[in-house]
Amino acid sequence: MKTLLLALAVVAFMCLDSVYPLNCFQCNRETWWKCSEAKRCRLGNKCYNLYNSDGKWTVKGCAQTCPTAGPDERVKCCYISECNRY
């Protein structure tokens, strides 16, 4: 019984991070160059960066699911606070 209780405590401790919303940088194609402060996202969202192929802009934000890249774009999703800084 003690072993089960200890195992549950360890699992709960490891999952604590997933209970809190992430802080993600959020900016669009017009404001990407001054995206300097992370904002709180909804619980369960992940951070993302959407890059165009020639490096002229980057869209940053948070979403329930990772966005789909369009032609000449690429997407990077991440799962810890402020992970979409660069």
Swiss-Prot record:
Presence of the UniProt keyword Secreted in the record: yes
InterPro entries: Snake_3FTx, Snake_toxin-like_sf, Toxin_cobra-type
GO MF annotations in UniProt: toxin activity
Disulfide bonds: 24-47, 27-35, 41-62, 66-77, 78-83
Keyword Signal: yes
One of the Pfam families matching this protein, by short name: Toxin_cobra-type
Keyword list, A-Z: Disulfide bond, Neurotoxin, Secreted, Signal, Toxin
Signal sequence coordinates: 1-21
Subcellular location: Secreted
Tissue specificity remark: Expressed by the venom gland.
Main location: secreted
Biological role stated in the UniProt entry: Probable neurotoxin. Is not toxic to mice and geckos.
Family: Belongs to the three-finger toxin family. Ancestral subfamily. Boigatoxin sub-subfamily.
Protein name stated in the entry: Sulmotoxin 2
